């Protein structure tokens, strides 16, 4: 392939009369604002006749399968819905064209119509809860969907043959400035011991990228008459599910159990290294993952960054991580278990992707380089070089692609089974 121009994703309706074009599939949440969802829809005016073309953006939280009419609750909740009448253009929906829209309209012709959505910054990022091996249907989680369809009005039943549905993602990247180095300490006084046991732990930094090892520095000062028999280090994912009420689910994603001992009246210092990988946690039902991709293309869910004053009640899933250091202390003495207790501290940290570098508008590709995506379609080039790629999003195991809503939810994992 020669010069590579601006990449644009496209998807057509089954009857080919409606095609949506988007400049990207991932839209970045910058905390204070979110990238606008801007694109165009190409329509066949002869097919439309008296009908209109609408485009909707929906953020939905799918929290379980549809059971036998339990209190009339459905299995999904729309957190945000916005509608635009793209054709014929409605005056109230008219917005200034973005550079991408100008170029697409110039290339596609007069029957290409723009649409733009603003995503509120307090909506959740795209998160999928990992389905179990036996689960079928759509997985639980938060997703964003752009839908274009032909109808006489918004209330009319949407037919699959003349509609287009595209799943996009709202993502966050690691901030450029990390927070303070995580440290924690605690002191425990035991019965029958004059002096305490002191545990201090720290991480080498506050922000880790996915796949990066986490170094945990553990320092123990044992002035008691008891022995520390074992040291347990774990990385835990916490998912706050904010829907009808708030519930927190925790899941270990990396663990190490060391047989290191600390004798009475002695000190101990060691650095432990753990690396949380999705590959080691594939069977954990309900684990929070980034977006809606296949296992090979996704990872553990990134930490959620919240702006000050964010309304936690409308945020579907808030993800955070902590390292827990636990000392297992020997049980002995006349009082047995009453005279001993485990000692633990927790270290919060951030797990995210680094902000990707901005790609230049034109990039030279060596002639012997094999294209990554075989669905890439390059149309005739001109001064506004645009490369169209089929909009295809590989799904997590157990997901459906563009099924009718009434088919959704069968066998989805339930939050209360996590």
Curated annotation (Swiss-Prot):
PROSITE patterns per UniProt: ARRESTINS (PS00295)
Residues covered by region (Interaction with CHRM2): 45-86
Residue ranges, annotated region (Disordered): 353-375, 397-418
Modified residues (Phosphoserine): 412
Post-translational changes noted in the entry: Constitutively phosphorylated at Ser-412 in the cytoplasm. At the plasma membrane, is rapidly dephosphorylated, a process that is required for clathrin binding and ADRB2 endocytosis but not for ADRB2 binding and desensitization. Once internalized, is rephosphorylated. The ubiquitination status appears to regulate the formation and trafficking of beta-arrestin-GPCR complexes and signaling. Ubiquitination appears to occur GPCR-specific. Ubiquitinated by MDM2; the ubiquitination is required for rapid internalization of ADRB2. Deubiquitinated by USP33; the deubiquitination leads to a dissociation of the beta-arrestin-GPCR complex. Stimulation of a class A GPCR, such as ADRB2, induces transient ubiquitination and subsequently promotes association with USP33.
Keywords linked to the UniProt accession: Cell membrane, Cell projection, Coated pit, Cytoplasm, Cytoplasmic vesicle, Membrane, Nucleus, Phosphoprotein, Protein transport, Signal transduction inhibitor, Transcription, Transcription regulation, Transport, Ubl conjugation
A single cellular component GO annotation: cytoplasmic vesicle
Modified residues (Phosphotyrosine): 47
Presence of keyword Transferase: no
Residue interval(s) of motif [DE]-X(1,2)-F-X-X-[FL]-X-X-X-R motif: 385-395
Stretches with biased composition (Basic and acidic residues): 355-366
Gene Ontology biological process terms, A to Z: G protein-coupled receptor internalization; negative regulation of interleukin-6 production; negative regulation of interleukin-8 production; negative regulation of NF-kappaB transcription factor activity; negative regulation of Notch signaling pathway; negative regulation of protein ubiquitination; positive regulation of cardiac muscle hypertrophy; positive regulation of ERK1 and ERK2 cascade
Positions of region (Interaction with TRAF6): 318-418
Cellular location(s): Cytoplasm; Nucleus; Cell membrane; Membrane, Clathrin-coated pit
GO function term, MF aspect, one: ubiquitin protein ligase binding
Result of changing residue 390 to P: Abolishes interaction with AP2B1
Pfam families the record matches: Arrestin_C, Arrestin_N
Keyword Cell inner membrane attributed: no
Residues annotated as binding 1D-myo-inositol hexakisphosphate: 250, 255, 324, 326
Region (Interaction with SRC): 1-163
Domain notes: The [DE]-X(1,2)-F-X-X-[FL]-X-X-X-R motif mediates interaction the AP-2 complex subunit AP2B1. Binding to phosphorylated GPCRs induces a conformationanl change that exposes the motif to the surface.
PANTHER family for the chain: ARRESTIN, BETA-ARRESTIN-1
Family, as annotated: Belongs to the arrestin family.
Function (record text): Functions in regulating agonist-mediated G-protein coupled receptor (GPCR) signaling by mediating both receptor desensitization and resensitization processes. During homologous desensitization, beta-arrestins bind to the GPRK-phosphorylated receptor and sterically preclude its coupling to the cognate G-protein; the binding appears to require additional receptor determinants exposed only in the active receptor conformation.
Description of how the protein assembles with itself and partners: Monomer. Homodimer. Homooligomer; the self-association is mediated by InsP6-binding. Heterooligomer with ARRB2; the association is mediated by InsP6-binding. Interacts with GPR143. Interacts with ADRB2 (phosphorylated). Interacts with CHRM2 (phosphorylated). Interacts with LHCGR. Interacts with CYTH2 and CASR. Interacts with AP2B1 (dephosphorylated at 'Tyr-737'); phosphorylation of AP2B1 at 'Tyr-737' disrupts the interaction. Interacts (dephosphorylated at Ser-412) with CLTC. Interacts with CCR2 and GRK2. Interacts with CRR5. Interacts with PTAFR (phosphorylated on serine residues).
UniProt-recorded name of the protein: Beta-arrestin-1
Organism whose genome encodes this protein: Homo sapiens
Gene (UniProt): ARRB1
